Amino acid sequence: DLRESPALVVIKHLIDEGAKIQAWDPAIKEHHAAIPQQVELGESPIAVCRGAEVLVVLTEWDEFGLLDAEVIAREMDRLAVVDTRNVLNRKDWQAAGFVHQGIGR
């Protein structure tokens, strides 16, 4: 049940501000109906980073902590990441050239 999901609150706010949202979540098929229609769902975390200006991590899936910052850097237009769950290794992402903002650090 995603009705009170903090991630959806952030996504809806970003859409209201004019952002184009590409999203990936390993459990998205179970909750597809709750996702705003403006959100483009991708097949993988790498796919949704192609051409992105900012990577925003809103959930704590283990898969996000395993992302290779160097691989993601080659896909994105700008190297900026906001990690709201602190699942990414800050040093690895900064070493790959990212401006990394963790929330709560």
Residue ranges: model-predicted function:
Residues D1-R105:
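Structural/interface elements that position substrates and couple domains in central-metabolism enzymes
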